[in-house]
Amino acid sequence: MPVSYNRISLTDSIGYSEILDPKLKTNTLRIQFFHPLEKESAAKNALAFSLLTTSNAVYPSMEELAKKLDTLYGISLTSGVTKFGDFQTCGITVRTIADRYALHQEPLLQEMTDLLLTCLLQPNCVTDGFTEFEFQTKQKDLLDTIEAEINEKRAYATAQALETAFQNEPAALSCYGKKEDVLALTPQNTLAAYREVLHTAPAEIYFVGAESQPMLLEKLKAALTPIDRPNVPSYTFHVPSPAKAEPVTVVEPLPVNQAKMVLVLKSDCDNRYVMQMVSYILGALPSSKLFANVREKMSLCYYCSSSYSTPKQAMIISSGVEHDNLEKAKAAILEQLTAIQNGDISDAELESARMSIYNTLNGIGDTPGSHINWYQGCYYWNNYHTPEDSLKQYLAITKEDITKAARTLKLDTVYIMDTKKEEA
């Protein structure tokens, strides 16, 4: 039997999607809130959602919650924040085996739903703030996450490039906030931020399992309908970033052995399918021009690849380069783009891109999370369709379409993490 999908409005501002895949032996439930990415709230939201799945009012310590999870066949309970363009997504996910596979057919779906709702609606707090011990523990974890991003130089270089490329736009921010933002948090203002999300942010709930669960829908409706959410806005998630009049170059000397260079180019083409194809031809694959030519033939980069931000309409090209090769590498990278703009696309390159897209789309459904990610993407675009529908869109794209789209790309930002010279 094929996968079936159905979405209904649980309330005016909460959607409920049921994704049924007969091959699954697990049930997965996720709730996601969508909040504008803001300096004032990013760190608060990141910390708050990590606290929600650390303990709650019913299981008021990490140990007690862990024991509860162990009694339920090791239910997976996770939370986290991510970034999509100008928005921060904040979510909680629970997953366990389907009831019929439990040793005594225990009502695990009901238990995991109750657990998610308890975490969501009954956080562990005292005097209008999260409890101090859990707060300090998760605050340190968040600081460690931010520090790890800084220490991972490739990711850091990309983040710095985007900060310049999207200057004065929410997309310039990290979904975790900055270290100083995290250090300024208190149990009180973190709980207040969570309550603001709960009462004002649009939300989507996703259930993925083998069978329809009417009980689940009724339980969610009974728990969430009473929440006071009077004026929840609806958002447009596709917010293209305008290109700068002239490219901006930022050079940051750091004590690294290998320089990093990130180029950000912006487009006014709103066809995300064809722009993704441009990226596949340019640098998203081992068969792409950047890897085959700049890295392999010219030996100018240790790595060189591209990715495309659909909500911001921005192409991001990331490379690791020796200091002495920075200018050569930049010129060579832009030459590969020029080649595409001039129609230099081989049949093999086009077929490789199509095959990669086919494999990616064909893999949707291998995990419950891939189902959710697909339909959350549909939510962002307010366009619900299947992976098969998308494949048809991609396969219809011609070399001429790719060439025309590539010509819309304009260099916006060059970020260079340069090797710091030791002082004599």
Language-model features: locations:
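Proteolytic maturation boundary segments
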Residues: 1-20, 212-251, 404-424
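Hydrophobic side chains in well-ordered alpha-helices
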Residues: 112, 193, 216-219, 274, ...
